[in-house]
A protein has these predicted regions:
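Extended, H/D-rich, highly charged conserved domains that either
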Residues: 39-254, 259-262
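Intrinsically disordered, low-complexity regions enriched in small/polar residues
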Residues: 17, 27-30, 62, 71-72, ...
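Short catalytic helix/loop segments, enriched in acidic residues and glycine
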Residues: 25-47
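Glycine-rich loops and low-complexity Gly/Arg-rich segments
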Residues: 33-36, 219-222, 238-243, 291-294, ...
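Conserved beta-strand -> loop -> alpha-helix junction used to position metal-binding or nucleic-acid-contacting
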Residues: 11, 27-30, 215, 219-220
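Active-site catalytic pocket residues across diverse enzymes, especially alpha/beta-hydrolases
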Residues: 32, 207-210, 288-291
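SIR2/sirtuin-family catalytic core signature
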Residues: 1-28, 255-371
Length: 371
């Protein structure tokens, strides 16, 4: 009798997208849950990013943009405000006098500027009625507002994901049939652990995976505690180190390094293996590219298309310190492109059959996926 195998499954946002969940950054940005009108310099910066191609923005792009924003600050110890001194003086008068009598009519250019920046809001017409919803936060320091803005992004994203959360129905998707295959593999006696970098639940209608442990690397929206930030190997002024993932009070990621080391098989679905999560994967892939002490592991990576496949290989090249050939020679990793299954159908078939899927049913699955 064969010994049970240890299988580690790593999920990224591509997994949720393959299940047809609207979990792109663009989906969140276009929703009412995104705090894009909050008067913080950070929000103003993010609103200017990717105006023509938000549909292509990945979550790691957002995390990288947090770093770009920090690097754009002339003096991080003071921050950089979007509100000018004249606008601040006008806001202070609003605080003192309100909008009565339209005293600000000779400063409408400043009023319009503040409206455009999301600091003041219209409350109907005419323009003389602006100011009724003065945002008191606007008078606080830009650093204070940026820190609150990041918290609002997390809160808004949690609420957005809860609003779209529902059991996944039986579907024709590679992600769905991966879950079915994992369920059958666990029932056959192998040990499986799922490590997800998503904030969503791993569940699907009519099929329970309760016996498979699921570890959320960066929190989950059910608990209302999620981690968004840039990588923690950077030097930042203490005023802005709240942008680092590791500085979040909720940051207690489970150990993934040891399970990867002990695994017989590693399955990755929809994760870019990008720079911001490099610390989790680099030790594993560097070890698997060691010709002096070769230990083969089964590695299967599900990604979307040719472009994402190239990005994956570039990430692996970097994590193995240029030993991509050694990684391939020792382990023979398999990359399956979910949007190119016509070309990769044999790879998908072999994967399903190797994970306790009936051969006839595996053929049916491939047929449905190719429709």
């Amino acid at each position: 009798m064969e010994e049970p195998r240890k299988i580690i499954v790593i999920l990224g946002n591509g997994f949720d997208l393959d299940l047809n969940l609207k979990t792109r950054y663009q989906d969140f940005w276009e929703s009412d849950y995104c705090p894009k009108r909050y008067p913080a310099p950070l929000i103003h910066h993010l609103n200017q990013c990717w105006p023509d191609n938000r549909n292509a923005v990945k979550w790691y792009d957002l995390e990288n943009e947090l770093l770009n924003y920090y690097n754009s600050l002339p003096d991080p110890s003071k921050g950089h405000d979007i509100i000018t001194d004249d606008e601040r003086a006008l806001l202070e008068k609003f605080t003192a006098y309100g909008h009565a009598c339209g005293w600000y009519q000779d400063q409408l250019d400043l009023v319009v500027s503040l409206v455009n920046k999301g600091v003041l809001e219209y409350n109907g017409n005419p323009l003389g009625r602006v100011g009724e919803h003065l945002k008191e936060d606007a008078l606080k320091s830009p650093i204070w507002r940026d820190k609150k803005a990041l918290g609002l992004i997390k809160e808004g994203l949690c609420n957005y994901l809860k609003s779209i959360d529902k059991p996944i129905p039986d579907s024709v998707s590679s992600a769905f049939h991966l879950l079915l295959a994992l369920k059958k593999t666990a029932e056959a006696g192998d040990f499986i652990d799922i490590f997800t970098f998503n904030y969503t639940r791993v569940q699907f209608h009519g099929h329970t995976i309760d016996d498979i442990p699921v570890h959320h690397m960066h929190g989950n929206c059910e608990d209302g505690k999620i981690i968004i930030g840039t990588r923690d190997d950077l030097k930042m002024a203490k005023e802005y180190d709240f942008l680092l993932k590791a500085m979040d009070d909720s940051f207690t990621p489970p150990d993934i390094v040891t399970p990867l080391k002990e695994a017989d098989e590693v399955i990755i679905f929809g994760h870019s293996l990008g720079e911001n999560d490099r610390q989790y994967f680099a030790p594993f892939f560097l070890r698997q590219a060691d010709f002096d002490n070769p230990v083969r592991k089964d590695i299967t990576i599900f990604t979307r298309d040719d472009n994402s496949k190239v990005e994956i290989k570039r990430a692996l090249q970097k994590m193995t310190d240029g030993k991509l050939s050694a990684l391939w020679s020792i382990n023979q990793p398999v990359i399956i492109r979910t949007a190119n299954l016509k070309e990769d159908q044999q790879l998908m078939y072999d994967f399903l059959v190797a994970h306790h899927t009936d051969k006839h049913y595996a053929s049916e699955v491939i047929g449905k996926l190719l429709q």
